Amino acid sequence: MENPANANPIRVGVIGCADIAWRRALPALEAEPLTEVTAIASRRWDRAKRFTERFGGEPVEGYPALLERDDVDAVYVPLPAVLHAEWIDRALRAGKHVLAEKPLTTDRPQAERLFAVARERGLLLMENFMFLHHPQHRQVADMLDEGVIGEIRSFAASFTIPPKPQGDIRYQADVGGGALLDIGVYPIRAAGLFLGADLEFVGAVLRHERDRDVVVGGNALLTTRQGVTAQLTFGMEHAYTNNYEFRGSTGRLWMNRVFTPPATYQPVVHIERQDHAEQFVLPAHDQFAKSIRAFAQAVLSGEHPREWSEDSLRQASLVDAVRTGARDIYFP
């Protein structure tokens, strides 16, 4: 993809003052030469003002007012998942490119409709799975292609976190909270990244907290048509885990901190073959910065990779299958 180095920066407006925007996305947008934050909207003006005092741009009260601005070319959407479909649609119809936090929507039909709107208007809609832009995964894929563990027999991935405070948005099912949409989408997306487009749902268990009617953990089993399985674990009532592992015909390969590595973290690839073990230390990278750069380059070049939308739609199908096909366990 061409790097439009001499292009004017994309003027970005932010809809929603979420924690992920404050900690990760806005610092990356501010540091990226191809983007300029021109406006930040919140339903509360004082909250928008606090964000702009740190990251620049104009504070805007209310999301519709931001979409009416002429100084906004693209919109970043870090809202709760249940609000994504409405505000992505409104942003696209206002002529803005959109970078939306994962999950893009809460189901595949909504995602299909939004990508259709984007195509009709010649706009980019990108789901921000930032971990996909870290080079460590390409390096792992290259090692696997070289046969470091033989033929891949199975894949396992886990992303679990300890319980959050009682009022945390993850426990609010009415705004798209819950472990599946907030956390489970990561191992599902990793399975698709490495095992390909023919992944199928086999089974799942979702553990619901009865009082709040929210999913707090789960496991899913997927398979390729050749019988390579993906065993996925996710939850928010666990010890912290953040890893994936491949088992092959002659060995295994695994890594930790695969989904949310800090920008200064040097990933370590572990490989075991019979009585032989080795480690490879990979360079540190800022995956948020790389995600922002990929979005900006695609907007400025006009090249909107079709595989991005196709991957997002396959992901949405798998998440839908896990949600609707799972055995639901309620406690206490």
Swiss-Prot record:
GO MF term list: nucleotide binding; oxidoreductase activity
Functional pathway: Antibiotic biosynthesis
Result when mutating K102 to A/M/Q: Loss of reductase activity
Top-level EC class as recorded in UniProt: oxidoreductase
EC number: 1.1.1.384
Catalytic reaction annotation: dTDP-4-dehydro-2,6-dideoxy-alpha-D-glucose + NADP(+) = dTDP-3,4-didehydro-2,6-dideoxy-alpha-D-glucose + NADPH + H(+)
Quaternary state and interactors: Homotetramer; dimer of dimers.
Biological function: Involved in the biosynthesis of L-digitoxose, an unusual dideoxysugar attached to various pharmacologically active natural products, including the antitumor antibiotic tetrocarcin A, and the antibiotics kijanimicin and jadomycin B. Also able to reduce dTDP-3-keto-6-deoxy-D-galactose and dTDP-3-keto-6-deoxy-D-glucose to yield dTDP-fucose and dTDP-quinovose, respectively.
Family the entry assigns: Belongs to the Gfo/Idh/MocA family.
Record-given protein name: dTDP-3,4-didehydro-2,6-dideoxy-alpha-D-glucose 3-reductase
Provenance organism: Actinomadura kijaniata
